[in-house]
Regions:
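A domain-start/cap signature at the N-terminus of enzymes
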Residues: 1-45, 79
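Structural cue for short, hydrophobic secondary-structure segments
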Residues: 49-51, 82
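Active-site machinery of serine-nucleophile hydrolases
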Residues: 56-123
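Conserved acidic catalytic loop of the alpha/beta-hydrolase fold
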Residues: 124-142
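Alpha/beta-hydrolase fold nucleophile elbow
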Residues: 139-150, 171
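Short glycine-enriched nucleophile-adjacent loop
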Residues: 154-165
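A conserved short beta-strand
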Residues: 166-178, 198
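The feature captures the conserved acid-bearing segment of alpha/beta-hydrolase catalytic domains
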Residues: 179-246
Length: 269
């Protein structure tokens, strides 16, 4: 007897996806979402995952296991949302560079403006369009949101923290590209931060040995450590973690467990 397997595309349990074209950025986004636990009266807390095409599957699988209270066995309620692109790649380098980088200086050449500097537009997409879409389907708590970002995604997280810190309550940022444009993001570093915001910064041990010309060897790790200290002096709830044996590519996966366990502690009821 011959067997002819009927191969089909794999699916993620509990996950759904759609696409949305933003009027603010002009780009089309692949949105993956999964609602876990019983929805609270005030709506689901939300974890936004930047580079969602790369990280949503891993974070969802970990959250399904690690967001469970070990005593009550109840699942911390949350909506996990991956923000990606529709081009079919793990990372769309050109689109993420536009979305995740802060505004360029006024004298920046037009060639750079075509590649970078649209973080404000991307923020309006999240605030005005994506949040409304999610709320209409799931009902969300817009006062209790978190963001996970890596590299340029973490740079976007820092820019949001510095300019509109109330946009998210929890910032989970790994290997932030503070070096970009001669550390331009630090131009927005505030004098104070609101109470009640949690910041978790991380980097891989081997990122401190980076020899790329656009990232000095002292950049990724040392600058993240220095920034954590600065934010601490501003009164922020901040913690920096250095992941042994991790490099820029795998550091976010080392950090995922810490990020999910942090959210379990703040979101568990």
């Amino acid at each position: 007897m011959s067997i002819r397997p009927n191969w089909q595309a794999a699916t993620l349990l509990q996950a759904e996806e759609t696409s949305i074209t933003s009027a603010h950025t002009g780009r089309t986004y692949r949105i993956q979402a999964a609602a876990l636990g019983e929805r609270p009266a005030g709506g689901y807390p939300v974890l936004y995952i930047l580079d969602g095409d790369a990280f949503f599957p891993a974070i969802l699988n970990m959250a399904q296991s690690l967001l469970i209270n070990p005593i009550t066995k109840s699942h911390a309620a949350c909506l996990i949302v991956g923000i990606g692109y529709t081009g079919g790649t793990i990372r769309d380098l050109s689109q993420r560079a536009l979305d995740y980088t802060p505004p360029l200086p006024d004298n920046a050449p037009e060639s750079e403006r075509k590649q970078y500097g649209q973080a404000d537009r991307f923020s309006r997409f999240i605030n005005d369009e994506l949040s409304a879409l999610l709320d209409s389907k799931y009902r969300i708590d817009t006062q209790n949101q978190a963001v996970f970002g890596h590299s340029f995604g973490a740079l976007y997280g820092l820019y949001s923290l510095f300019t509109r810190p109330e946009r998210f309550r929890h910032y989970l940022l790994v290997s932030p590209s503070i070096w970009w444009q001669d550390r331009r993001v630090l131009d927005w570093l505030p004098d104070t931060l609101p109470q009640g915001i949690g910041i978790r910064l991380g980097a891989g041990e081997h990122e401190g040995r980076n020899n790329r010309p656009d990232q000095t060897s002292s950049g990724m790790v040392a600058q993240a450590k220095i920034l954590a200290g600065t934010l601490h002096h501003l009164g922020a709830d901040v913690r920096f973690t250095l992941y042994p044996n991790a490099n820029h590519g795998n550091a976010p996966f080392y950090a995922l467990t810490d990020c999910i366990e942090y959210l379990r502690n703040v979101w568990q009821r």
